[in-house]
Each structure stands twice: as structure tokens, then as C-alpha cells.
């Protein structure tokens, strides 16, 4: 009997645990380890940040749901991974031995890159976790009591730009509903992207035109090619550069309320494993999600290293979105199962297809990129009220999946396949490893 450990219980790790247990059955043991004892649906955090959703709407305790599927659950943070001995040391000092390890930890938020940008230090908030989103809402309520300048956007090195656009548009929409939009003296969007709608992936469809128009309609002044150097005394210090990376403007923006997506790094326990990660702490994997150094370690989601799609004047990263992450998870599960069944030569690849819904207040933006990284076979970006409704429905659907203990229900698989969207490169399912 082999012991497979999933490290991390987010939108990658929790589906991975369910899918792994379903694939391996009772003949092998599956353990899920998470620093949190609850699951949170991170894509809904922008709503929490303005009070449109509460914590209990998007988060729930993990243990009951995974243990009834025969998955062992440990609510402890991993402090160290000994890849040679195949042991994980937990925060309480206990160790867990594994035969196979799948890393799905998500990121460490690199607030230290920009002095004063930590939500606990000043006016700039984060919505990367539900805890941060709740704090952002508390600060937003303070803004409503005493209006002032708003700055929202993404830091240099950020890779998850969608939520920045979402939150900016949602805040603008909420202010209008409250009759307070005209009380905000300035509303600024600051991004490290070379142009609006780049999204870290050279844009999708007409994302540039649609998002530029959306920000303009809301009266939000946008600046691209920007890096925030520090936040101090309710001021944000920003440097804007040209196409060659040369400084063209230094700005000091007043900020009563802000939200900036930080750059990501790998979590310390993972980043500290010799030869496992790149300098940023992200796991170096091959096209089958397997570590390039350790054959029994796999990784999926934000935890893996994906090079930027292009060199930009201000550093930007490539995002790892929901369906793309599920694609990675499915490939890793297939390959671990093949190993355990003595079929180590058979390798499966994920498609890395991306389907994303972003709420923009009373409207929304959706994109389908097959695959997410260019060159693409499908490249569509759409905008309208239907996307807002679709995201509301998807949140409820995904949370229900996680409570039911199913990674990919058959009807989801059939429906997506009819649309030409699959998790795995089926033609490579039995591809022989070179």
C-alpha cells in the first residue's frame, strides 16, 4: 500500500485529494495536509471585500467532507520537506512519510517586496485570502464613513491580474449603488502590465479594448508599466517606465483605501527543498507535472514554475487559473496512478485550457483560452451581465462539488467536451515517456 500526500487544500489541492482517492481506491492511502482547516473559494474574495458575500458563503470546514471519502486530513502547516527521506515535518513537530507527494500549496504573498504594502501596516489591502478580504471590507467600511482617494491594481511581479480589475469595478459599482461615487476625490488603477488587459498572457481576445473601456466608463484613471516602490503615510510611491524600462514619471498618490495584488513566491517549506524549485520558490516540473529532480514529487497550480510569456518593461508573471489548475491536477493523478500500477512509461499531459469568469459589478468578463498560453486554438473574451450571473452560479457549483467530494462530475466532463474543452490531452494518454 502506497501513501500519497497532497500538500495544500485550495482550489487545486482539495479536488486533487478527491480525484486521487477515486483513482487509487482503498488499496492506497491518501492524506491531505493544509495549514487551514477550512476550504475557501478564492475567486469570490472580491465580493467579500465589499460585503456582497460573507465568509460563510464561500468557506467551510474541510475535515467532515474529505474523511467521509476515506481521505486522512491533517490541519497543520508543513515546516520542512525532506525529499530524500520522503518526510514532511509539521508545525507540531510530527512527521508524515510519503511515497508520492503532490504539491498544491498556492503561494506565499510577497508583501516584503514593497515596504508598507502589508495589509497590517497601512491602507493597502489584499483579497488573496478570505482573511485578507474580510480585512479589506472593514477598511472599505471606514472609507464609506470618511471618503478619500482609492488606488487599486497589481504590483510588479504579480501574475494574477484578473482580481485587480474585478475589485476595481466592483468597488466602483458598489459606490454608485450607495450614491457615494462622487464623494471619492480620485480613483486610480495601477498595474505592472504593459497595457490594460494584458493579464500576464498577452491578452485574450479583445481584453485590452473591453477592460480599457470598462475602467474609463467608471471614471477610473489607469496607469500601466508601473512599479510601486513603497507605501508610507497614506501615500503610494509609483514609478512608471517606458517600453525600454526607462523611468518616465514618478508619482506620489494619496490613498485612503487601496488594494494591490502582490507578487507571489513559493511557500518556505517547498522553496527550501534543494533542487526542487526555481529562485522564486516555484516547483520545476516537466510537461507531466512531475518534478524535474524528484520522480515521486508532482506539483500543480500556483506552486509550479511557469516562465513569463514575454519580457515586459516591468516584471509580470503568467497566471494559473481554475480550470488550468484542474487540468494539471488530473494529469498528475493519472501519472501517479500509472506509476503505482507499474506503467511508469505511460505519461499524461494536461491541456492547460483556461475558462474564467470575472465579475465587474452588475456585469462581468469571461474568457476562454485553449490553451491559456499562446499559441491558442480558441481565444475569446466576452463582456456582459450574463457573466456576472454565470460567476454567481459557478461559485455555488464549485463549492457543492467540494462538499460532494467530486473533482469532475461526468456531466461537467461531457458538457465541456462538447465545447471542445478537456482537462487532458487525450491523444497523449498513452504516450511513452522518452
From Swiss-Prot:
Details of cofactor binding: Binds 1 FAD per subunit.
Active site residues according to the UniProt entry: 160, 356
Molecular functions (GO terms): NAD(P)H dehydrogenase (quinone) activity; nucleotide binding; quinone binding; sulfide:quinone oxidoreductase activity
Compartments, record wording: Membrane
GO biological process: aerobic electron transport chain
Recorded topology in the membrane: Peripheral membrane protein
EC number: 1.8.5.4
Any one Gene Ontology cellular component term annotated for this protein: membrane
Keywords: FAD, Flavoprotein, Membrane, Nucleotide-binding, Oxidoreductase, Quinone
Coiled coil: none
Outcome, altering residue 126 to A: No effect on FAD reduction. Strongly reduced activity with decylubiquinone
Catalytic activity, reaction form: n a quinone + n hydrogen sulfide + n H(+) = polysulfur(n-2) + n a quinol
Effect noted on mutating residue 128 to S: No effect on FAD reduction. Abolishes activity with decylubiquinone
Enzyme category, top tier: oxidoreductase
Cofactor: FAD
Binding partners and assembly: Homodimer.
Function: Catalyzes the oxidation of hydrogen sulfide, with the help of a quinone. Consecutive reaction cycles lead to the accumulation of a polysulfide product on the active site Cys residues; these products are released when they exceed a critical length, typically as cyclooctasulfur.
Family to which the UniProt record says this protein belongs: Belongs to the SQRD family.
Protein name per UniProt: Sulfide-quinone reductase
Organism for this UniProt entry: Acidithiobacillus ferrooxidans (strain ATCC 23270 / DSM 14882 / CIP 104768 / NCIMB 8455)
Amino acid at each position: 500500500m502506497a501513501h500519497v500526500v497532497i500538500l495544500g487544500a485550495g482550489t487545486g489541492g482539495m479536488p486533487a485529494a478527491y480525484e486521487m482517492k477515486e483513482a487509487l481506491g482503498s488499496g492506497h492511502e491518501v492524506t491531505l495536509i493544509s495549514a487551514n482547516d477550512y476550504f475557501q473559494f478564492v475567486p469570490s474574495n472580491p465580493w467579500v471585500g465589499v460585503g456582497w458575500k460573507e465568509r460563510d458563503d464561500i468557506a467551510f470546514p474541510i475535515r467532515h467532507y474529505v474523511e467521509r471519502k476515506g481521505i486522512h486530513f491533517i490541519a497543520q502547516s508543513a515546516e520542512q520537506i525532506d525529499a530524500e527521506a520522503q518526510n514532511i515535518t509539521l508545525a507540531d513537530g510530527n512527521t508524515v512519510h510519503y511515497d508520492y507527494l503532490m504539491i498544491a500549496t498556492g503561494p506565499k504573498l510577497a508583501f516584503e517586496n514593497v515596504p508598507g504594502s502589508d495589509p497590517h501596516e497601512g491602507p493597502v489591502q489584499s483579497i488573496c485570502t478570505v482573511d485578507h478580504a474580510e480585512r479589506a471590507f472593514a477598511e472599505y467600511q471606514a472609507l464609506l464613513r470618511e471618503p478619500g482617494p482609492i488606488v487599486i491594481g497589481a504590483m510588479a511581479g504579480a501574475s494574477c491580474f484578473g482580481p485587480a480589475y474585478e475589485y476595481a469595478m466592483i468597488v466602483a459599482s458598489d459606490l454608485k449603488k450607495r450614491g457615494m461615487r462622487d464623494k471619492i476625490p480620485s480613483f486610480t488603477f495601477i498595474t505592472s502590465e504593459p497595457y490594460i488587459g494584458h493579464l500576464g498572457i498577452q491578452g485574450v481576445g479583445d481584453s485590452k479594448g473591453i477592460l480599457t473601456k470598462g475602467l474609463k466608463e467608471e471614471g477610473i484613471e489607469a496607469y500601466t508599466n508601473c512599479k510601486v516602490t513603497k507605501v508610507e503615510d497614506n501615500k503610494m510611491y509609483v514609478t512608471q517606465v517606458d517600453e525600454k524600462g526607462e523611468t518616465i514619471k514618478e508619482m506620489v498618490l494619496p490613498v485612503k483605501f487601496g488594494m494591490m495584488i502582490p507578487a507571489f513566491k513559493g511557500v518556505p517549506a517547498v522553496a527550501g527543498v534543494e533542487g526542487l524549485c526555481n529562485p522564486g520558490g516555484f516547483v520545476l516540473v516537466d510537461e507531466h507535472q512531475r518534478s524535474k529532480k524528484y520522480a515521486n514529487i508532482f506539483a500543480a497550480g500556483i506552486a509550479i514554475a511557469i516562465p513569463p510569456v514575454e519580457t515586459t518593461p516591468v516584471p509580470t508573471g503568467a497566471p494559473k487559473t481554475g480550470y488550468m489548475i484542474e487540468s494539471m491536477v488530473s494529469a498528475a493523478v493519472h501519472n501517479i496512478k500509472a506509476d503505482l500500477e507499474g506503467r511508469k512509461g505511460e505519461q499524461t499531459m494536461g491541456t492547460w485550457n483556461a475558462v474564467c469568469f470575472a465579475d465587474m459589478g452588475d456585469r462581468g468578463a469571461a474568457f476562454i483560452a485553449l490553451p491559456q498560453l499562446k499559441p491558442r486554438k480558441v481565444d475569446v473574451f466576452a463582456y456582459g451581465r450574463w457573466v456576472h450571473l454565470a460567476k454567481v452560479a459557478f461559485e455555488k457549483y464549485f463549492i457543492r462539488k467540494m462538499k460532494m467530494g467530486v473533482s469532475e462530475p461526468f456531466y461537467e466532463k461531457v458538457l465541456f467536451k462538447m465545447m471542445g474543452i478537456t482537462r487532458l490531452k487525450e491523444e497523449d494518454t498513452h504516450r511513452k515517456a522518452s
